[in-house]
Amino acid sequence: MKEIILIKDFDPIDLTSLEIISRLNQFYKVNIFINSSLPNKVEIISIIKLGLEDYNLINQVNILNISREELLKLDSNYIKIDLDNNISSDQFIKTKYNQDKFYLDENFLSVDLTYIDNKLIQKGICFYTSISILKYITEYKRYFALDVIKYLSKSRYEHVLRVANISYKIALSNNIDPYKAYQAGYFHDLTRNNSLFLQYKDKVDKKYSKYFPKNIIQDFMYHQFTCEYALKDIFNITDEDIYKACRYHTSGYDNMSKLDKVVFVSDKIEPGRDYPSSYLFVTCLNNIEDGFKAVLKANKDYLESREDYSSINQNLLTIACYKHYLN
């Protein structure tokens, strides 16, 4: 039986590569080539194994940790596929979540799929790797997470991890792209309680102050608006879906996408909050539209119970959100 050797920069391994491995594994013995000269090969292999576990492939796929010279010497029993060169590449995943991204011909060698550049994952520009790998990267602070922790306190960072995880679960349950949900949940508080927002204060005032009493944006609202500027400048993220989910996660507004709603509710009901929210989480899992309205109503009731309600919630964005979704 011939064996496949897949060659790519698997640092970290991406969703498309995992899908290819899963398909090929039905008909071939699959090997993943890792260059033994890489200084961080041990961690790369550990991360690959996390992805293989998510795809139930951990005991079926072999990781070939050898040099390139040794790879070239392998005999004709091995079919070598260079995924970086044999896949049509457009630098980014553009198909919608859960659509078929590729097919294999009758020999299961020819592929037509959307290429994912692993460096985009390293930089935090896209999150299209397995959920266990995302958790490893963010919890153990690898790749892009090394930059994120520069701006967030320990408690704030723990909060964004919880929001990211809840966002992923709710999105997955509602057939919404869970990787974008994790990404938006993870980045949503990037400019909260740090000096980053000061760099963008003038831009935000000019664009959004008209929605607030006396044209003054409350301090706790700034970070939702400044986030997208930091995402673009620091991480080169240009995805408007991510921008928008972060832009209104505190105030809400009257034309929210499903992704916007996922991040909004996840921020409000993550388990670190000091009020019971498990029933709201279940409602969101079952139906994000019903869950969003339930969370919005619960949040409105909570804010109205506060003595400072008139000063914290009387902005046109939140008022429009209540009017559109609760009336």
Locate the predicted segments by residue.
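Nucleotidyltransferase catalytic core that binds NTPs
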Residues: 1-147, 232
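Histidine-centered active-site/metal-ligand motif
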Residues: 10, 14-17, 159, 188, ...
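Divalent metal-dependent catalytic cores for phosphoryl transfer on phosphate-bearing substrates
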Residues: 52, 61, 149-151, 168-295
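Charged phosphate-binding loop/patch that engages nucleotide di/tri-phosphates or the phosphate backbone
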Residues: 126-147, 302-327
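Long, amphipathic alpha-helical surface segments
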Residues: 288-309
